[in-house]
């Protein structure tokens, strides 16, 4: 049971990280390797977006740490399908959170249902 709990925490962290990264980069101007990255005024004026991106990257790091615990307690063939749940959670969150403004379709929803069914098939007891 410990492995599934660590896996779920990892998946939730990845989901939050994806949402933060998406929000952060969408609210930044066009990304390029210009000198503006060294301009304090530019950095300060985009601090909220940059903090979101950094928090998203930190979320990925924490997720990997949790994933190591997942692998410690679960066989890989049971643990790895859990990662697919992040697709489901991200889809649900962008459907619920209006500022992402993403389209939800019947076909995409069917895909999410297939993912859930696949995770269930792989994870059930033998």
From Swiss-Prot:
GO MF annotations, alphabetized: carbohydrate derivative transmembrane transporter activity
Name assigned to this protein: Probable 4-amino-4-deoxy-L-arabinose-phosphoundecaprenol flippase subunit ArnF
Cellular component annotations (GO), alphabetically ordered: plasma membrane
Function: Translocates 4-amino-4-deoxy-L-arabinose-phosphoundecaprenol (alpha-L-Ara4N-phosphoundecaprenol) from the cytoplasmic to the periplasmic side of the inner membrane.
Pathway info: Bacterial outer membrane biogenesis; lipopolysaccharide biosynthesis
Domain of life of the organism encoding this protein: Bacteria
GO biological process, one term: lipid A biosynthetic process
Species lineage: Bacteria, Pseudomonadati, Pseudomonadota, Gammaproteobacteria, Enterobacterales
Bilayer disposition of the protein: Multi-pass membrane protein
Ranges annotated as spanning the membrane: 5-25, 50-70, 80-100, 103-123
Assembly notes: Heterodimer of ArnE and ArnF.
Stretches of the chain found on the membrane's Periplasmic side: 26-49, 101-102
Record carries keyword Ribonucleoprotein: no
Family annotation (InterPro entries): Flippase_ArnF, Small_drug/metabolite_transptr
Segments in the Cytoplasmic topological domain: 1-4, 71-79, 124-126
Family named by the database record: Belongs to the ArnF family.
Gene (UniProt): arnF
Keywords carried by this UniProt record: Cell inner membrane, Cell membrane, Lipid A biosynthesis, Lipid biosynthesis, Lipid metabolism, Lipopolysaccharide biosynthesis, Membrane, Transmembrane, Transmembrane helix, Transport
HAMAP family cross-referenced by the UniProt entry: Flippase_ArnF
